[in-house]
Swiss-Prot record:
Lineage, uppermost ranks: Bacteria, Bacillati, Bacillota, Clostridia, Lachnospirales
Cellular component annotations (GO), alphabetically ordered: cytoplasm
Protein name listed in UniProt: Probable transaldolase
Family the entry assigns: Belongs to the transaldolase family. Type 3B subfamily.
GO MF term list: aldehyde-lyase activity; transaldolase activity
Any one GO BP annotation for this protein: pentose-phosphate shunt
Domain of life of the native organism: Bacteria
Subcellular location: Cytoplasm
HAMAP family to which the protein is assigned, alphabetical: Transaldolase_3b
Pathway the protein takes part in: Carbohydrate degradation; pentose phosphate pathway; D-glyceraldehyde 3-phosphate and beta-D-fructose 6-phosphate from D-ribose 5-phosphate and D-xylulose 5-phosphate (non-oxidative stage): step 2/3
Keywords of the record: Cytoplasm, Pentose shunt, Schiff base, Transferase
A family per Pfam: TAL_FSA
Length: 217
């Protein structure tokens, strides 16, 4: 399974990229707003760091297909690695159809049902982003959605890739891998958590203590 980092924070992106564990980045209007920087400025800097798919979303206030198509073309023109993130709506699907026909990669976001994922795939989406954590928040098993979409896409041979989103903890990542997600887009803090295990820490401390006992510092 491939990993993307889910953030617009350039420093976190650099740290994740330096580990060699990510091959893409996802952003959204909330993450961009959190940084308090110009969208194009942030995206251009991200493309200079990570050589892989970079998802940039149309403005949250753009709700019509015509507007999404216009903005999608502008986002795609920033860099060849750009992926246009489109919300799962009727107008969004119209935009995906047009953009995909022009060879522009799209990521349909805010997916909360298998039917939504199927519609997005039929419209030509490059990626679909089902949200685990937000489903878990309302007592619905988010991982079951990943499993359903993966099985359906396998049955019918869809090329659309599944990006598991709204990842809250390392257990989500493991579950997504087992459920068949192609990609997990993960906050940097969760990537850091994934590197840790108490037995690893104990093992390092033991090795260090044994070495010092014989050779000193």
């Amino acid at each position: 399974m491939k990993f993307f980092v889910d953030t617009a924070n350039v420093e976190d992106i650099k740290k994740a990229n330096d580990m060699g564990v990510i091959c893409g980045v996802t952003t959204n209007p909330s993450l961009i707003a959190k940084e308090g920087r110009d969208f194009n400025e942030v995206i251009k800097e991200i493309t200079s760091i990570v050589d892989g798919p970079i998802s940039g979303e149309v403005k949250a206030t753009t709700v019509d297909a015509e507007g999404m198509i216009k903005e999608g073309r502008e986002i795609a023109a920033i860099h060849p690695n750009m992926v246009v993130k489109i919300p799962m709506t009727v107008e969004g699907l119209k935009a995906v159809k047009v953009l995909s026909s022009e060879g522009i990669k799209t990521n349909v976001t805010l997916i909360f049902s298998a039917n939504q994922a199927i519609l997005a795939a039929n419209a030509g989406a490059t990626y679909v982003s089902p949200f685990l954590g937000r489903l878990d928040d309302i007592s619905q098993p988010g991982i079951e959605l990943i499993r359903q979409i993966s099985e359906i896409f396998d049955i019918y041979g869809y090329d659309t890739e599944i990006i598991a989103a709204s990842i809250r903890n390392p257990i989500h990542v493991t579950d997504c891998a087992l459920a068949g997600a192609d990609i997990a887009t993960i906050p940097y803090k969760v990537i850091e958590q994934m590197t840790k295990h108490p037995l690893t820490d104990q093992g390092i401390e033991k090795f260090q203590a044994d070495y010092r006992a014989v050779f000193g510092d």
